[in-house]
């Protein structure tokens, strides 16, 4: 029998984006071919997908470190890098994804349902993509963005219709073994069941699933016994069944006290839940009472004495014996009726319309109103920290060994309004400024509030502005001179050139 694992911690690392290429076209008869560096490919995502053939999280316990493929680098001749392959992890239905802060990222219940838990980094732009009318031959490219790295917790909550709860040795495992084909471990000592058991019960060409969780004892909410950890497997159930040992020999125990103690523990568990499982409060779930071991002497007498008090709960009461196999059919049909009623309610309840609005990566407004914040570093007076998703990405994608790339970054920050915001925050020339984890000594390019455009933008190739190549006009005059149509004279510096028509 495979080991049942219902909670694991995964260490995820999505693929890094590939670097852009810094290349110039070199081809015969193509002078000044221009930049032709391709873009890097995006890194691969890490995706969780529900697979109904998977029933446990066991595989992840031995392989908790997960890494997706990085994107390939760009190349010359405008060749873009390939995107890294997405890594898909198959999880069982009922898997809940929780981040490091305890927030639920996704609740995966439907077969084929997918969620991206770690996003790959964007590929860097090649110098061909960075070229513009004012930056015709960039001598740099952008680096790939690192992929998302995080730790997530996967919790499995069984998708059972009926949940069996009760004290240890109440006969829960025996009941699931006689109602279904499941073969759980059964022994005559407490806490025989250390992991949930699932079984499928057939009734009139219909089926429902039943879950047996480890036994509860008073004080379980405080950590006694196995605690309340396994109760997550009954959060999604349509009905809770109290399995009570009607033949308990302990003088301080009886069916009525057992049920009250169990309800107290369930109430404590529900109070600790941050959100329900979509079926409402666990305390309001339908319940039935199952008095087990009615084949034992004095069990009938004990049940008769407690029946009037048990009826005050207002729940159906069933007397069964898993050994003699009595009362099982009545119980089976009653549970099936409750499950069917629940399924009708779920089918008739329209699902809320979910409107997905993608989160914008860039600023809501362009220019100096980019989405970033500037605040003073409390640990270093006089220093400042700039935070913003897009600003941080610019830092990560800058090659700080390339002066032209650094200048391009400075231009972008100035156009985004970072310099003006730093002035307003009180920064002066030489102040330490931290952006994206990298600290600079601030050297402002422009005076605050003044729009200054440099004569030559960074990344602009001056060779394209100044050339010694002969112009078409000069070639025409030289041709006329060779044919004797005109006579050309060259004078020294400072004198005006003069052309006299040749008289022959």
Curated annotation (Swiss-Prot):
Compositionally biased intervals (Basic and acidic residues): 458-476
Domain OCT intervals: 364-444
Binding site for Mg(2+): 173, 193
GO molecular function, one term: magnesium ion binding
All copies of domain Obg, residue ranges: 2-159
Cellular localisation: Cytoplasm
Chain residues that bind GTP: 166-173, 191-195, 212-215, 292-295, 321-323
Top-rank lineage group of the source organism: Bacteria
Region feature (Disordered): 68-88, 449-481
UniProt-listed Pfam families: DUF1967 (PF09269), GTP1_OBG (PF01018), MMR_HSR1 (PF01926)
Record key words, sorted: Cytoplasm, GTP-binding, Hydrolase, Magnesium, Metal-binding, Nucleotide-binding
Entry keyword Plastid: no
Cofactor(s) annotated in UniProt: Mg(2+)
Gene3D superfamilies: GTP-binding protein OBG, C-terminal domain, GTP1/OBG domain, P-loop containing nucleotide triphosphate hydrolases
Main location class: cytoplasm
Entry keyword annotation includes Metal-binding: yes
Name of the molecule in the record: GTPase Obg
